[in-house]
Amino acid sequence: GNFHDCQELEMLYKNHSQIPNHCRFFHTDYYTASMVKYSINTFLAMKVTFMNQIYKMYSDHEEHSRNPHPEIWRAFTDMLSADLRVGSSHLQVPGPDGQYGYGGSCLPKDIKAFIGYDKNERLSVLRDVELANTQIRLTGDSKPK
């Protein structure tokens, strides 16, 4: 929206909500805000899909397939998340719903919307992620049968 409206909305949030004082506010237009939201959620969907594929590859290794302990995987993800560029979110396999791949209401909806919005098909990686996740959710494996 316009700068004045954004400032007023920011003050309303700061003065009448539980938003912490350290929360950053960005004044931008609707298109940019939408692109940020879809970019974040589709990136997280890619991260979940990637981690599920890594999990399968890791657990298929003969040493770990004989002894697949959750503690070993947790130590692996702890090492990954120690790199601040990776971070600790969306590394859990299976996910918080106890299933493999991403689910819930946001990530599947947003990746479909972003793919649909991409009329020039620049985001082909998202189509691959959606296909892999569908396979993971159905079978627990990212390889087509």
Predicted regions and their residues:
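Structural/interface elements that position substrates and couple domains in central-metabolism enzymes
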Residues: G1-K145
